Amino acid sequence: MQVRVLYWQEIPSLIRVTADDGAQLSRQLPDSFQQEIDRLAMEQGLIGSDAYLEQFVWHELEPRDGAPNDVLDAVEAELVAPRGA
């Protein structure tokens, strides 16, 4: 199963898993991640601009085995734990 994480600069925002059959599941990370993105974007003067959107980049993770929801749970736990969100 392919796993990708959407980042705004260095802050993860969304997890997407794609099964071998092409089925996709996505999960937004907790609100605290979006709040941090918004805070930094305001500090950098990027709110409401194309430059804000240009900061979003997909990162490919190592393929994972397991059920899609289990993979989403595992990746979310890995991303949330270091930030204590």
Regions found by a protein language model. Name each.
Residues M1-Q24:
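Short, charged/polar N-terminal "headpieces" of proteins
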Residues D20-V57:
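Acidic, aromatic-enriched beta-alpha/helix-loop junctions
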